[in-house]
Amino acid sequence: MPIFRPKHQKLILQCYPPGKGVDKKPNPSELSYLLYYASTRRVKLEKVVTFLDRKTTSDAKHNRAGNLQVTLTIISSLIEECSENLNVFASFVCSILKSVLQSKDLSLCKHAIQTYGVLCSKLDGGLFSGDKVFVDSFGSLSQNLINIGSENSKKRGPNNLEWQMISLMTCRYISNCLGYNSKFSKKFIEICIPILTETVHANNKQSNLLTILKSNVNIEDENHHLGRIASTKTNQTSRKAQQDLDNDAVKDSDLNEEALRGLKALFSTSLTSQISEATRAIVKNNYATTIDPIWGCTFLEMCTTWIPVQLRFITLSTVLSSLTSLSNKSTKKTSNYPIQLLYANYCLGLVSSDVNMIGLSISDVIQQILFLQANLLLSQSHYFQEEDVKKLSMIYSNCICNLSTHIYYFDQVPDSIREILIKVVSILENSVISGNANSSGVYRFIITLLEDISIIFDLLQTKPSNISRNHVSLEDWDLSLILLSSEIGLNPTKDQKPLFSYEQITDIQFKYLRVFGYFLNNELVTRNENMETGAINSIESFNVGGDHLQPDYNNYISDPGNFIAHFLGYVDKFFSGQSLINIDNASLLQKVLKNMILILGINFINNFVPFFFYWQLPLNPNLVDDNTRIKDTLGYTLIYHSLIKMDKIYELNYVRESEFFNSLLGDINYRKLNKLWVNGLQSKEEDAVLDNHHALGHRDENGTLRFNPTKKNLEDFVIGNAFTLSWINPHRPLILDIVNNYIPKKENNQNVLSDMSDESSIIENSSYHTSARQNGFGLGLGNANDISSIHSGLLFHQSQNVNMKNAFSNGNETSNGSIYTSDRQYNTPRVSDLKDSVLMKKKPGVAFNEHYNSDTTPGSILSKQMVTSDIDSILEGLDIDDDSEIIV
């Protein structure tokens, strides 16, 4: 033994009490002086730890357990006191700890894990980024600590649980260092997750996890509140577990608590990469160990609750990203179905739980899930088993429904519905354009998404959110109205086989009408709104905002391109197919339209008027087929229902006594007597009412067939009441070409009326039948009563709606003067309109627009200066019958 020693060696040796005892502690006064000495200069600190490293090697070799205990205490104190200079001696600390572990003594290893915990708490990113030697040494030390605990815990002995506790504590301590080096982080997350998961799985049933999950989520209900009591209990449990380890009295409950704390340390971080790696490791381990999927879902949800609330969405994004990658790589040889199913279940668990995810992009997530579902039904279904496809598709649908109804922001539900409808239309469009032969997959996809929408609305009713939300509007459905068409899946630009069969088209129409009808009664209006009994007493009461019964609500009257007009245009296309209309679909369509009458009132009626005249039976009996009879019956049923409900809703007490209404009833009875009426569309009660009227006035004294409800009848009806005069325009134009190709041109109808004896009757009705009977060319925009309103809004609606054209439009068809017409030659009035205007000494539209504005649109012919005397001489020379056909 040397007689003379350097000062730092003397100070160190003085800390060791004499004797060969196992449980030693450093002399407190000598230790204090040593710490002071080491903290004064970095050189002194380096000398101290260098000597301690050599002494530890010697003590471990000679099995001096008591001295090793003292050394570990000195090292812990140095780390605490000199943490700002930890980079000077961190590598020596790792070397000392590895020397201690070689003894494989439980008491020394328990002390070593405490020192390791102090070291991990003081490390920073500088050492991990600039000292590769330290990173390797620290990684080796951490691996040794985990292994020594795991290996000894599997051996039969009295201290298995204590050894397992050392591994679990290492996993918790190392979590503080995972954010400093990505490679290091990934390696040890993959090592720690299986150890922690196995311990939790061995000690917790799913019910236990649900209890922890509920406690973490902190659901605010009357049965549970998380407060100081729960927090205090957690701290007490932590201290008890440490005491049990020191006293060799570790229990399974201590291991469980330590594993949960380790998982919490892994996930309670602001590092997105660490959250993603931990999420992947959990799913990968659960798949490899065949853990019950339900237990695994709850386990992942529980871990997610420990993530800062603004970063929880990363877990869901990670699961979806991995699932998308697996879906894209899936082939017939390597389908990856089991792992896809597992990831899909975890995704469902996250979106359907009470775990809030602030910052989650709902639209993006729904798009991802819709992509996965489309890929499943259109591609993977070729090599997956049918039952597997159904199971996975159901999970995707449940994800969409639960995510859409877990409200995070005001417009979430409308955004979700729009995303679904956009996906439906885009898949349909791409399939038609590309000639995709997988019609069954596309059909199945459309039906599935429509069912998803129905479930979303049902969930919103049965489980309403406490968070205020916006409701889905009618306009959100505009893009999807193509599903009403009987020509859905048909590309008019190509001579190819239709995408869908008649049965598939019928099913799509039926499903769409069912979902839309449910939307009308449960989302657009609430359940407690009774449109039939909630009559509105006066026009002044319409000032209440948001009331769909309010005249011109959302410009449903003043805007010719409104949703109601679009919907009715597609209803017309519903009847345009070559096959016989399904009577059940027609009946369901009528119910939907009746609901629209109850909800929209005068707004619907005003838009429906031109369609009523257009849907009447052709006067040529040779052109009457089953579809035209159904359409005619639907038109008469709706106009009857409209008049009755208008009288009741707005308390007019006017309709039933009017000549138009009685003429309408007579016309209906005429159809019944002549077997032109289609039974089964209207209710039995309506049939009973209609059967009480007689057919009168359908033939004049010369025996000429006449239809009573004419435009003149409607004009007289409108003028007879202030409310109808203000809000019903009997001259509203029939706009069939909502977009080119939306409504097909009828054929072989050019001379339907040529044999009729009453030419004035022909002229009187032609404005409502022009598109079908004369191909709709050269008829301008309307007549004197609507020309003003159309001119004032035409340019605005052209620019606003030009992008809403049908996805299947070829753009080559000439417009008949629709609101989307871009050619200025059609934006002109008829001679008959100008004649009425000049002769009555007023501009068009005054009679039917009490809010008429005298200002005209720039460029309008109505703004030009006219010499009335010359105009009079010209107009008087024109025949009445020619007026309506001539365009200025």
Curated annotation (Swiss-Prot):
Coiled coil: none annotated. InterPro entries: EFR3, EFR3_HEAT-like_rpt. GO terms for biological process: protein localization to plasma membrane. One of its GO terms (cellular component) is plasma membrane. Belongs to the EFR3 family. This is Protein EFR3. The gene is EFR3.
